[in-house]
Amino acid sequence: MVQRSKSSANWLREHFNDPFVKQAQKDGYRSRASYKLLEIQEKDRLIRPGMSVIDLGAAPGGWSQVTSRLIGGQGRLIASDILEMDSIPDVTFIQGDFTQDEVLQQILQAVGDSHVDLVISDMAPNMSGTPAVDMPRAMFLCELALDLATRVLKPGGDFLIKIFQGEGFDMYLKDVRSKFDKVQMRKPSSSRDRSREQYLLGKGFKGA
């Protein structure tokens, strides 16, 4: 218990001293994660006015805020998370466990017959600190997100997902490369140095 309290205190200290946390509060973003997407956007120009986008693992809404602003009123954004998320204007939010078929069907129903231009995912499982447990959970979410992307993306569409280096990564990378014309890795400066997270970007979906 003492160790946990010490760890929690260290996290809180790091959190409140984090310049991106302070900047998010100043800019009105719900989380520091907004700057990860903004940095990737600055480099890759993924999000454009009028696009249709799916945001997985959306809560508390940092990526949805950025995306909604960039796609504008003519765009369409469907966001989903197992956690609650305060509403964002013009964003369709589906709360539920993405690994459950019922929630997946709700997302597919919201997409309808018109496919989307971009699928983004900042999903991560609750980490136990044990890689042998955490990596399979993380890769399972990545695999489900890729499966959804291949069902809803237009040919030429793009896919951005948080991923962790470890067991299963190389096979997943190979799978994404088979489905997209170009695959790149991104590590935004706003991603903490000690974090093993990276972002995998697949551009130019080859079609189902």
Swiss-Prot record:
Matching SUPFAM superfamilies: S-adenosyl-L-methionine-dependent methyltransferases
Predominant location: cytoplasm
Entry annotation: catalytic residues: K162 (proton acceptor)
Domain of life: Bacteria
Cell compartments where the protein resides: Cytoplasm
One GO cellular component, as annotated: cytoplasm
Keyword S-adenosyl-L-methionine found: yes
Binding site for S-adenosyl-L-methionine: G61, W63, D81, D97, D122
Keywords of this entry: Cytoplasm, Methyltransferase, rRNA processing, S-adenosyl-L-methionine, Transferase
InterPro entries named in the record: RNA_methyltr_RlmE, RNA_MeTrfase_FtsJ_dom, rRNA-MeTfrase_E, SAM-dependent_MTases_sf
UniProt GO MF annotations: rRNA (uridine-2'-O-)-methyltransferase activity
Catalytic activity: uridine(2552) in 23S rRNA + S-adenosyl-L-methionine = 2'-O-methyluridine(2552) in 23S rRNA + S-adenosyl-L-homocysteine + H(+)
EC number(s) reported in the record: 2.1.1.166
Job description of the protein: Specifically methylates the uridine in position 2552 of 23S rRNA at the 2'-O position of the ribose in the fully assembled 50S ribosomal subunit.
PANTHER family, A to Z: RIBOSOMAL RNA METHYLTRANSFERASE, RRNA METHYLTRANSFERASE 2, MITOCHONDRIAL
UniProt record similarity statement: Belongs to the class I-like SAM-binding methyltransferase superfamily. RNA methyltransferase RlmE family.
Protein name, per record: Ribosomal RNA large subunit methyltransferase E
Annotated source species: Pseudomonas entomophila (strain L48)
